[in-house]
Structures are given as structure tokens and as C-alpha cells.
Design a protein with these regions (language model features):
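Hydrophobic, well-ordered secondary-structure elements that form the walls
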Residues: 19, 31, 68, 104-108, ...
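Solvent-exposed beta-hairpin/edge-strand motifs
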Residues: 120-133
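C-terminal beta-strand-rich structural cap/linker in extracellular carbohydrate-active enzymes
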Residues: 139-159
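Short, exposed beta-strand/loop patches in secreted or surface proteins that constitute
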Residues: 82-85, 95, 134-139
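Aromatic- and carboxylate-lined catalytic core of secreted/periplasmic carbohydrate-active enzymes
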Residues: 48-87
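Conserved alpha/beta catalytic core and glycan-binding cleft of carbohydrate-active enzymes
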Residues: 1-41, 96-98, 105-115, 131
Length: 159
């Protein structure tokens, strides 16, 4: 997360979204939620001390982490099934679901796209985008989603 040569904020958000949706405990290093900076070269310089002045925080990143944390607090996620589906070489989906609720996290490292996912056996009476910019709707047992370049999107579905 501190490698400026490979860091891409939008792709990073997708990786964090996947982490929050996968089973197990999400793990953040202090300050990640507010976009704290660091410098490369040594472990000591990899992270600056925590910045407590909110005017220096990346509020968009904080809003993103809050949305992921809120989704993660759903009690049903503790016993939900999961599935990972490859969309193509630049996108994949993490699905968490029970008989009554589901989250679909679509992680896009590529260009603007439209995706059709098989949602057989997932609850799909209602669909809401929890985080991200795009459109999502169900048609039969398919979830059709369109979203922008490098945009990752979290969708909630329920009966």
C-alpha cells in the first residue's frame, strides 16, 4: 500500500472491498482508513505517525472504509456462504450469501464494462448499490451491472 510505483487508488479500493467481503477478519494498518501517507526505503519510514487532525484526512477514503465496515457488520455474514467468480482477466466477483441476503462485490481493474453474473439461488427481489458508481439490475437469474474504469462496486440483494 505504500509503493508509489504500483499504487493505484481505485485498484486499492477494490482490493480492500474484497478483503471486507471475504471470510475471516479484515486487517488494516493504522491510518489506512484516512489515507495516511508514508515513504519507502525502510520499515521505519514506511509509515508516518498517525495524523489526528481531520483536515489532513482523505475523507473519501474514510467514507469508503465506513461503508465497508457497515456492510461487514451484517450479522448474517458470520455464517454466509461465499463464492469467487472470475469475470475476465481484469475483473472478478466476491459473493457472500444466505437464503435471504447477499452481497456481490465486483472488483474491476480494467476498463469500463458491463457484467452479467449468474445469481441462481441468490436472493434477488431487491437490489441496492451500497458503494460505487454504476447501475445494477436483475433479469431473471442474472445480475446485470455496468460500471466505470477501475471502479469496484458493492451490491446488496435481498428478499
Amino acid at each position: 500500500h505504500n509503493d508509489k510505483a504500483v499504487f493505484d487508488r481505485d485498484i486499492y479500493k477494490g482490493a480492500i472491498m474484497a478483503m471486507y467481503m471475504l471470510p475471516g477478519m479484515p486487517n488494516l494498518y493504522y491510518g489506512d482508513e484516512v489515507g495516511i501517507k508514508g515513504r519507502l526505503g525502510s520499515n521505519e519510514g514506511a509509515r508516518f505517525p498517525m495524523e489526528w487532525r481531520e483536515e489532513y484526512w482523505d475523507m473519501d477514503m474514510l467514507s469508503f472504509h465506513r461503508a465497508m465496515g457497515k456492510a461487514r457488520k451484517e450479522k448474517w455474514l458470520g455464517y454466509a456462504s461465499y463464492r469467487i467468480e472470475e469475470v475476465d482477466e481484469k475483473a472478478f466477483a466476491v459473493l457472500r450469501f444466505t437464503d435471504h441476503e447477499a452481497y456481490v462485490a465486483l472488483i474491476n481493474r480494467g476498463e469500463k464494462r458491463e457484467v452479467k453474473l449468474d445469481i441462481f439461488a441468490l436472493p434477488s427481489d431487491r437490489v441496492e448499490i451500497v458503494y460505487g458508481k454504476g447501475e445494477a439490475k436483475t433479469e431473471g437469474k442474472e445480475l446485470n451491472v455496468s460500471f466505470e474504469e477501475k471502479e469496484s462496486i458493492l451490491i446488496k440483494m435481498w428478499k
